[in-house]
UniProtKB/Swiss-Prot annotation:
PROSITE patterns from the UniProt entry: RIBOSOMAL_S19
Keyword RNA-binding in annotation: yes
SUPFAM superfamilies: Ribosomal protein S19 (SSF54570)
UniProt-recorded name of the protein: Small ribosomal subunit protein uS19
Length: 92
């Protein structure tokens, strides 16, 4: 079930403040965030966010195609190492 239109997109307040400060100062520093649930807004385009994946901050450069998506979609939380190789096939 999607979010109601009348509510509008969810963005943590501190994230908006940090993005506005970065845009006004012109600095290109990475903005660290733990808010994976926040929606990417149009004013975030061109900024780099460090989205926490539970282990470290993954750098995410926001482009126009990402607007409307959540930050968590771009920082995977699980690492798939691959399936175990067949030991019998390796010996031959």
């Amino acid at each position: 079930m999607t979010r109601s239109v009348w509510k509008g997109p969810f963005v943590d307040g501190y994230l908006l403040k940090k993005a506005d400060a970065a845009l006004s100062s012109g600095r290109k520093d990475v903005i660290k965030t733990w808010s994976r649930r926040s929606t990417i807004m149009p004013q975030f385009v061109g900024l780099t966010f460090g989205v926490h994946n539970g282990h470290k901050h993954v750098p995410v450069l926001v482009s126009e195609d990402m607007v409307g998506m959540k930050f968590g979609e771009f920082a995977p939380t699980r690492n798939f190492p691959g399936h175990a190789a067949d030991k019998k096939a390796k010996r031959k």
